[in-house]
Amino acid sequence: MASFITRAERSGNIFSRVTGLIRAGQLNWADRPLWYDVYVSSPPLTPPDWNVKLAKYDEPIRSIFYEEDVLRAKFYKTYRSTAGIQVDSSRTSVSQQFINEYKLVKSENAEATDDQLFEMTQKRLNENGIVLK
């Protein structure tokens, strides 16, 4: 079975192989590559590793959902936003205000379910003058 890493790559990284050639006299110091001096002056923080574990092609990709993502999706499912979001605006969007208020309500009512927290947040935002459509 063929491997994607050649035997030369397993014997060491390119820096160690060039260093070996210079020490053995097979490569003159004046003929060293341009990147060699840069590598010597500032080596990488973690050494290169040829034995990297790559994901297999048949492994499923894990779904990563944060609580805020699920809440934002539920918000937009309930209240369709017709307004555009301005990236350079200093104002927070209605959905972000909803999420911030939801976190406050959740910290005050830890025993409430998600649906109850959602309704409490709706009521609190309506009381504060933010109209949800």
Curated annotation (Swiss-Prot):
Subcellular compartments: Mitochondrion
One MF term in the entry's GO annotations: structural constituent of ribosome
Keywords recorded for this protein, A-Z: Mitochondrion, Ribonucleoprotein, Ribosomal protein
Pfam family, one: MRP-S23
GO cellular component: mitochondrial small ribosomal subunit; mitochondrion
GO biological process: translation
Tagged with keyword Mitochondrion: yes
PANTHER family: MITOCHONDRIAL RIBOSOMAL PROTEIN S23, SMALL RIBOSOMAL SUBUNIT PROTEIN MS23
Family affiliation: Belongs to the mitochondrion-specific ribosomal protein mS23 family.
Oligomeric and partner information: Component of the mitochondrial ribosome small subunit (28S) which comprises a 12S rRNA and about 30 distinct proteins.
Protein name, UniProt field: Small ribosomal subunit protein mS23
Gene: mrps-23
